Amino acid sequence: MIVYLFVFSISIFFAFLAERRRKNDMIYFLYLIVIVFLNSFIAGARNDNIGTDISFYAYRVFHTDAYLDLEDAEIDLTIVLLAKFVHFFSDTFGVFLFLIEAWIMGFACYAATLMRKKLSIVLFISFFCLMAYNQSLNIMRQSMAMSVMMCMLAYLMRKEYIKVVAFMVVAYFCHSTSVIGLLFIIAYYCVQQFGIKKTFLFVLFMGGILVVSFNILFYNLISIALSNNLLASQYERYAVGDYGETSKTAILICIMYIIPFLIILKNKPKVENFLTIFALVMSLALAYCSLGGEIVSRIRLYFTYVNILFFSISLYRERKCVTWLVLVIAVFNFVISIWISNYGETVPYHSKYLEI
């Protein structure tokens, strides 16, 4: 854990330096490159048992020729292409892990850069470290998709719709579940057409419908799809399992987040503040639905990545007491989920390269 805390501290320090030089593009980007490199280095230097999904697919993608066959790929295209790219110059698995994290953090920081006039890069990096970094060491394909989706949302806020479509396509080839990003496009459109109040009431209604119907229908549909070969067998492990404690913690955290951001939305009824609440309400509904299996828990993480971006925007120039309250909640979530529960099995950190 000390390694993570050290890296987080250094990253936040460089983010602070970048914040002070935000008007100087070259210096600003240089500091962000340092942050991306540092976090990617720690990810690449880790042992193969840090993160449960390494053994599930990452190691096999890199070392098994069958996974590298583009004509018969059994896994999402982007990570296969990345593995083939690494094989051009290295057979070291750590280089592959380094580039995966560089992709994740690179796109995340690019999204923050697109919105840098509306957010604090210090808050963005702080939230990323506390809410997403350890998860990115585990659910790598989804994290690659989620970071690209952050860029899609940034372009959506900038009303650059062709780029929105382009980044949605890239996210899809990282992980097919990224189609959930369409929900944010729909929510954004509804706000533009019907206003925040009506859309907010509709979101609450749909969240309630989701909670009531999901557990009844979803896992039955998953089982039917698996039995009829409509889903690959690799998804079977996501449809079962006991995620009760993890989901209960997520429900508590979502409720804690919703309270201050509802106050912000009431005082500042802006689109980005509404999208923050939208993501939190959907996270809360999915946290309840994920009491019975992992697949919903993983889908919920898309909203976590989105909130890293929107938290940073909503809290920009907000009262310090509100900002510190949200940061304390993020720290509490990190301690419970990562330090104590070790969700994703990224703690403790070990590296044969660094001899720790």
Where on the chain are the PLM-derived regions?
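Alpha-helical transmembrane segments and terminal signal-anchor/GPI-anchor hydrophobic tails
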Residues: S55-Y59, A66-Y67, V80, I185-I299, ...
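Membrane-interfacial entry segments at the cytosolic side of transmembrane helices
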Residues: N24-L30, Q193-F205, E318-V328
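Membrane-interface transmembrane helices that cradle and orient dolichyl/undecaprenyl
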Residues: M149-K163
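Short hydrophobic/aromatic helix or loop-helix immediately within or flanking a transmembrane segment
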Residues: S55-H63, D69-D91
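Transmembrane-helix signature of polytopic, membrane-embedded enzymes
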Residues: M26, A112-C129
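Short acidic/glycine- and proline-prone juxtamembrane loop motifs at membrane-interface regions
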Residues: S136-S143
